[in-house]
């Protein structure tokens, strides 16, 4: 009898060990970055740690892709992956890295701004770790679906109350949210260090224009919108008007003065750069969604959001076709293109002329067409 119990205990222990080992492999697989394949327009790749050496060799460090034109001009910083559970922002930045060239000016692209947050998922959300996009040759590109917050391995524990550098108080969990920690602290929490590194880049490289790419829940009021620092109001208005001429509806939201830590507020207040943040609707991160699957991430089809739309509960259009990733990336890329067109009209002495920006219709028809195959 005692031997039988001993055998059961050993069998149970072995089963637990197998589960733990398999879970560990799954967890650590998130630490490996899916490749980004730079196009011919990328002239240099640096690491963010160049602007804050203390993050070198940590999971906070991330690539900065530089697209430099033959002619001098303005300097543009494009941020993707501030929130890695908002893949439309990440993929729009990747599309720029893999396709775009500069004729004048310089573009700095950070597709995985909060790199650490790509290495895990939000707890208890049941989200997929990865999603894939098919390319015209039948191959697939794999990307990570991450978290809104910095990995606890890189930053733990969070305080009960987060005292922001401006003196404002926020919920303690916001210290893990990159878009609440700007302008950052070089010797602060890990997330603050990332914000400080990006802020140093803006200041040291004399960045003229910053665009931070996001997605928002369909039921969230700030949706399909340009959020702008007050200094960038005229630029945002011109961009909206030009987009509407192209048939792309987009809202304008001015950055709240008292809401601290956001890119558009803090970079705008602490530098000479014009700063905007773009939002596009994403059903896979909303609270009304059903099961969070890879298909929901890429296709954006959800029966609960369809019902919510019929009930008039959403702030973005939604029908049986869903809100696919192709469309979300297309909206971001088109808005950036028109934003730069508007910039060039307003500041002809600091132009940022780009070539090979994928067209809106082409991206809507298939994002995979504009992603480079992995050799």
Name every feature range the model reports, one short phrase each.
Residues 2-66, 190-209, 213, 218-375:
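C-terminal accessory segments enriched in acidic
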Residues 68-75:
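Proline/glycine-enriched tight loop/beta-turn segments at coil->beta junctions
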Residues 69, 80-84:
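Glycine-rich His-Gly loop
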Residues 74, 87, 285-288:
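Short, solvent-exposed loop/turn elements at domain surfaces
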Residues 75-81, 110, 181:
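Short glycine-rich or small-residue beta-strand-to-loop segments that form or flank ligand, phosphate
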Residues 83-91:
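Di-metal (Zn2+ and/or Mg2+/Mn2+) metal-binding site signature of metallo-dependent hydrolases
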Residues 87-88, 103-241:
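Active-site/substrate-binding loop(s) of hydrolase catalytic cores
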Residues 92-105:
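A short, Lys/Arg-enriched amphipathic alpha-helix followed by its capping loop at the start of a domain
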């Amino acid at each position: 009898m005692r031997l039988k119990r001993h055998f059961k205990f050993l069998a149970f222990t072995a089963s637990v060990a197998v589960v733990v080992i398999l879970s560990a492999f799954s967890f650590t697989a998130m630490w490996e970055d899916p490749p980004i394949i730079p196009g011919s327009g990328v002239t240099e790749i640096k690491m963010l740690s160049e602007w804050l050496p203390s993050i070198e060799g940590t999971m906070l460090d991330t690539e900065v892709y530089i697209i430099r034109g033959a002619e001098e001009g303005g300097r543009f910083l494009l941020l993707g992956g501030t929130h890695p559970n908002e893949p439309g922002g990440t993929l729009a930045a990747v599309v720029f890295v893999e396709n775009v060239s500069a004729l004048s000016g310089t573009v700095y692209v950070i597709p995985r701004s909060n790199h650490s947050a790509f290495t895990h998922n939000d707890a208890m959300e049941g989200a997929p770790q990865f999603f894939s996009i098919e390319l015209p040759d039948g191959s697939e590109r794999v990307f990570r679906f991450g978290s809104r917050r910095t990995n606890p391995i890189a930053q733990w524990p969070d305080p009960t109350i987060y005292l922001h550098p401006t003196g404002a108080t926020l919920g303690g969990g916001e210290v893990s949210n990159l878009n609440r920690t700007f302008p950052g602290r070089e010797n602060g929490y890990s997330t603050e260090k990332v914000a400080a590194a990006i802020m140093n880049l803006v200041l040291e490289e004399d960045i003229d224009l910053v665009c931070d790419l996001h997605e928002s829940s369909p039921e969230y009021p700030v949706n399909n919108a340009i959020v702008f620092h007050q200094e960038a109001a005229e630029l945002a208005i011109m961009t909206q008007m030009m987009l509407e001429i192209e048939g792309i509806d987009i809202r304008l939201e001015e950055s709240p003065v008292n809401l601290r830590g956001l890119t558009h507020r803090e970079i705008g207040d602490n530098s000479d750069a014009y700063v905007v943040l773009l939002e596009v609707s994403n059903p896979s991160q909303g609270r009304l969604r059903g099961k969070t699957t890879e298909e929901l991430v890429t296709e954006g089809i959800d029966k609960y959001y369809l019902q919510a739309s019929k009930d008039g509960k959403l702030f973005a259009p939604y029908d049986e076709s869903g809100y696919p990733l192709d469309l979300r990336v297309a909206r971001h890329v088109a808005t950036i293109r028109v934003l730069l067109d508007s910039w060039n009209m307003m500041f002809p002495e600091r132009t940022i002329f780009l070539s090979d920006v994928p067209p809106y219709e082409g991206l809507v028809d298939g994002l995979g067409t504009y992603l480079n195959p992995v050799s």
